[in-house]
Amino acid sequence: MTQYINTTPGMATAALAASLLAGTPAWAQDKTAADAWRFQLTPYAWMTGLDGSVRPFRGAPTVSVNKSFSDILEDLDAAAFVNGTARKGQYVLQGDFSYAATSDKAALPLGLSANAKIRQTSLTMTGGHNWMLSPQSSVDLMAGLRLWQIKAEVSVPGVGSAQSNTSFVDPVVAARWRYDIAPRWSTLVYADMGGLDVGSKFTWQVHGSVNYQVKENIFVSVGYRHLSVDYRDDGKRLDFSQSGPIVGATFRF
């Protein structure tokens, strides 16, 4: 048996208004959440080695530096590494701070030896746009700057020492790809390049990581990172690279 229920226009209007009012807070909340800034901070340890050559100024000896992470631990003065990301809708900002202080010895002609110390600080700042490639995958395309400060000192016992304090800025372009492997597992690959004789002759870096979600806003990561720079100016040369595993923890808020 079919039962008919009569509704007056006033009742229908009230019902429609009630349904719209009931739905408005959820829609507004979703829109507000999508437009809100989201941040994440990742302090990490970089078990890096150092390979390259240093000539602090024209006429100074060129010293080759080649140290593994275990070698660096013996002479490491200090190190600090942290990465941060901010997102709002499809826009993304990223910053990465890296500091490492190392030293080494090298043989010179005539039976002499030289001591080399390098203090390298870099700050990479980029901004760009995020694209969703699939429900599990997204890519950030960004551009920005890498600021360098490199302090180098070469000393020859009984002869003398030479110092160099070099600061410069490199333009960089960057890409970051993320893929969700499983509900709590993801992988991340990042690469950038720049310099192109604006600051340094050339600089580039790449790193990849596998990430595990421990809690809603906490992730742990393991991966590998390589960073390289080749700077030459008026006889001065700073050409070195750093490579090694990374271990970090990410906090989202």
List each language-model region with its residue ranges.
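Predominantly the C-terminal beta-signal and adjacent terminal strand-loop region
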Residues: 201-253
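Residues that define the transmembrane beta-barrel architecture of outer-membrane proteins
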Residues: 35-37, 76-80, 119-123, 137, ...
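Repeated loop/turn-to-beta-strand initiation elements of outer-membrane beta-barrel proteins
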Residues: 90-93, 136-137, 183-187, 217-220
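Residues on the lipid-exposed face of transmembrane beta-strands in outer-membrane beta-barrel proteins
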Residues: 41-43, 82-88, 125-129, 143-145, ...
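Solvent-exposed loop/turn segments connecting transmembrane beta-strands
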Residues: 74, 135, 193-203
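Transmembrane beta-strands of outer-membrane beta-barrel pores
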Residues: 45-49, 69, 88-90, 97-103, ...
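Flexible, solvent-exposed loop segments that connect beta-strands
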Residues: 52-70, 101-118, 149-165, 231-238
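Short glycine/proline- and aromatic-enriched beta-strand/turn motifs that initiate or cap beta-hairpins
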Residues: 27-99, 248-252
